[in-house]
From Swiss-Prot:
<protein>
    <recommendedName>
        <fullName>Chaperonin GroEL</fullName>
        <ecNumber>5.6.1.7</ecNumber>
    </recommendedName>
</protein>
<dbReference type="InterPro" id="IPR002423">
    <property type="entry name" value="Cpn60/GroEL/TCP-1"/>
</dbReference>
<comment type="subunit">
    <text>Forms a cylinder of 14 subunits composed of two heptameric rings stacked back-to-back. Interacts with the co-chaperonin GroES.</text>
</comment>
<feature type="binding site">
    <location>
        <begin position="30"/>
        <end position="33"/>
    </location>
    <ligand>
        <name>ATP</name>
    </ligand>
</feature>
<feature type="binding site">
    <location>
        <position position="51"/>
    </location>
    <ligand>
        <name>ATP</name>
    </ligand>
</feature>
<dbReference type="InterPro" id="IPR018370">
    <property type="entry name" value="Chaperonin_Cpn60_CS"/>
</dbReference>
<feature type="binding site">
    <location>
        <begin position="87"/>
        <end position="91"/>
    </location>
    <ligand>
        <name>ATP</name>
    </ligand>
</feature>
<dbReference type="Pfam" id="PF00118">
    <property type="entry name" value="Cpn60_TCP1"/>
</dbReference>
<comment type="similarity">
    <text>Belongs to the chaperonin (HSP60) family.</text>
</comment>
<dbReference type="GO" id="GO:0016853">
    <property type="term" value="F:isomerase activity"/>
</dbReference>
<keyword id="KW-0067">ATP-binding</keyword>
<dbReference type="InterPro" id="IPR001844">
    <property type="entry name" value="Cpn60/GroEL"/>
</dbReference>
<keyword id="KW-0547">Nucleotide-binding</keyword>
<dbReference type="GO" id="GO:0005524">
    <property type="term" value="F:ATP binding"/>
</dbReference>
<comment type="function">
    <text>Together with its co-chaperonin GroES, plays an essential role in assisting protein folding. The GroEL-GroES system forms a nano-cage that allows encapsulation of the non-native substrate proteins and provides a physical environment optimized to promote and accelerate protein folding.</text>
</comment>
<dbReference type="InterPro" id="IPR027409">
    <property type="entry name" value="GroEL-like_apical_dom_sf"/>
</dbReference>
<dbReference type="GO" id="GO:0005737">
    <property type="term" value="C:cytoplasm"/>
</dbReference>
């Protein structure tokens, strides 16, 4: 086992604080409308330019192991805030730095660290309650656009695009961000259910100019099995031909004789058919077939539940207004499914999302909800260079997370004002701890709540104390707009922060800061001295004389 380096008390805390400050100072320059960029060097390719706090934090690794421990713990604050709300990483880092700095001063002055932590926790619980009172619902497109604009660093086109996307696919809909091919940002909305499976044979194509298949008011056969024998399909094909409508077959696979016969029938115009593979694999495929069945009012023909293809009638088939199939995708538009049944299915999947443990499962279930509930929107980010594209895409993703958080828990006045109002309300209510040390902890937390506003002002090149005092003297959503350098009603000016983002930033900052204040000892590996490690193998050189043994 490697030897350890151990530091105690003040020695440990000073080292840890130095690491915290290096990381936080690098992150906090990005805060606010006039925050600066940070350039990250990559071992390959061009450097990345970012204004995203968590991206800066993730790059920092310090040489001194004790300082690095401090930096890594604050990095955790940014990561947790990012995971919970998708934004507010810089605010969380600034809050953590302030609580740790003030808290360690109090510890050095002889306060009890455990009581300080309890005081900080009391103040944070009270602040979260105050934030909930200050929160207003974010329901209309204008508010959503404003939140997106602020989060995307005052880029109003991004805010507008996100608001349009949410309007089209609903607040629960799936919105993805992709790299576009032009200079302008674009919004692409796919209505109806789309899945990533294309036609099984190009001979089904009936729109040669677009290379796609379009079926108007088709019947939809859903089969959870491979279809290779055409005989089991005959009753259904005859019934569909009599009805004079096209047929879409979605099955595990259609192959051999069955596929060949379907192609011949289509080319001769006897019955208009198209076949695609069912989306997904294994259990997920079964679930997605069931989703399509709910959407189109059909039944999944599965031998597991005793249904056979030969006995399938028109009643078992789903229907939709229109289906469009190309090489890679199938879109079912306006399924005839019962609205109540679709909502029931959506509620069932939402329950699964709550129970899911892995992010991948949650994402896939969320996609299924969107496909059933409204559709999918794709924001294509445009930029002149690859470096700008990466930076912009990260900003748009942040803005999207922020708007989702705003829809979930509402919004508060931005620019650090909400935390100042929460702190003022706690002071006015006269929150007290069980002893004097806890009271100091409460003061530490309340002072830290001013730090985001102060940092925004510093980054804008103004005097922090003057502006902080002016904002404190006001009430409600009165604050300072660092972008236009004027005071006023932040909500009226469209400067909003999602309540969830502000709340998460404060809670995670206080959680990690509390642990660091109560640290008394730090242990790390001593650097190993590898210089003598290779010396032992040198004595084998004499073996060369063994050639004469033959």
């Amino acid at each position: 086992m490697a030897a350890k380096d151990v530091k105690f008390g003040n020695d440990a805390r000073i080292k840890m604080l130095r690491g915290v400050n290096i990381l936080a100072d690098a992150v906090k320059v990005t805060l606010g409308p006039k925050g600066r960029n940070v350039v990250l060097d990559k071992s390959f390719g061009s450097p990345t330019i970012t204004k995203d706090g968590v991206s800066v934090a993730r790059e920092i690794e310090l040489e001194d192991k004790f300082e690095n421990m401090g930096a890594q713990m604050v990095k955790e604050v940014a990561s947790k805030a990012n995971d919970a709300a998708g934004d507010g990483t810089t605010t969380a880092t600034v809050l953590a730095q302030s609580i740790i700095t003030e808290g360690l001063k109090a510890v050095a002055a002889g306060m009890n660290p455990m009581d300080l932590k309890r005081g900080i926790d009391k103040a944070v619980i009270a602040a979260v309650e105050e934030l909930k009172k200050l929160s207003v619902p974010c329901s209309d497109s204008k508010a959503i656009a404003q939140v997106g604009t602020i989060s995307a660093n005052s880029d109003s086109t991004v805010g507008e695009l996100i608001a349009q996307a949410m309007e089209k696919v609903g607040k629960e809909g799936v919105i993805t961000v992709e790299e576009g091919s032009g200079l302008q940002d674009e919004l692409d909305v796919v209505e109806g259910m789309q899945f990533d499976r294309g036609y099984l044979s190009p001979y089904f194509i009936n729109k040669p100019e677009t290379g796609s298949i379009e079926l108007e008011s088709p019947f939809i056969l859903l089969a959870d099995k491979k279809i290779s024998n055409i005989r089991e399909m005959l009753p259904v094909l005859e019934a569909v031909a009599k009805a004079g409508k096209p047929l879409l077959i979605i099955a595990e696979d259609v192959e051999g004789e069955a596929l060949a016969t379907l192609v011949v029938n289509t080319m001769r115009g006897i019955v208009k058919v198209a076949a695609v593979k069912a989306p997904g694999f294994g259990d997920r495929r079964k679930a997605m077939l069931q989703d399509i069945a709910t959407l189109t009012a059909g039944t999944v023909i599965s031998e597991e539940i005793g249904l056979e293809l030969e006995k399938t009638t028109l009643e078992d088939l789903g229907q939709a207004k229109r289906v469009v199939i190309n090489k890679d995708t199938t879109i079912i538009i306006d399924g005839v499914g019962d609205e109540a049944a679709i909502q029931g299915r959506v509620a069932q999947i939402r329950q699964q999302i709550e129970d899911a443990t892995s992010d991948y499962d949650k994402e896939k279930l969320q996609e299924r909800v969107a496909k059933l509930a409204g559709g999918v929107a794709v924001i294509k980010v445009g930029a002149a260079t690859e470096v700008e594209m990466k930076e912009k895409k990260a900003r748009v993703e942040d803005a999207l997370h922020a708007t989702r958080a705003a829809v979930e828990e509402g919004v508060v006045a931005g620019g650090g004002v909400a935390l100042i109002r929460a702190a003022s309300a706690i002071t006015a209510a006269g929150l007290k701890g069980d002893n004097e040390d806890q009271n100091v902890g409460i003061k530490v937390a309340l002072r830290a709540m001013e730090s985001p506003l102060r940092q925004i002002v510093v980054n804008a090149g103004e005097e922090a104390s003057v502006i902080a005092n002016n904002v404190k003297a006001g009430s409600g959503s009165y604050g300072y707009n660092a972008y236009s350098e004027e005071y006023g009603d932040m909500i009226a000016m469209g400067i909003l922060d999602p309540t969830k983002v502000t709340r998460s930033a404060l809670q995670y900052a206080a959680s990690i800061a509390g642990l660091m204040i109560t640290t008394e000892c730090m242990i790390t590996d001593l650097p190993r001295d590898d210089k003598g490690a290779d010396m032992g193998a040198g004595g084998m050189g004499g073996m060369g004389g063994m050639g004469g043994m033959m």
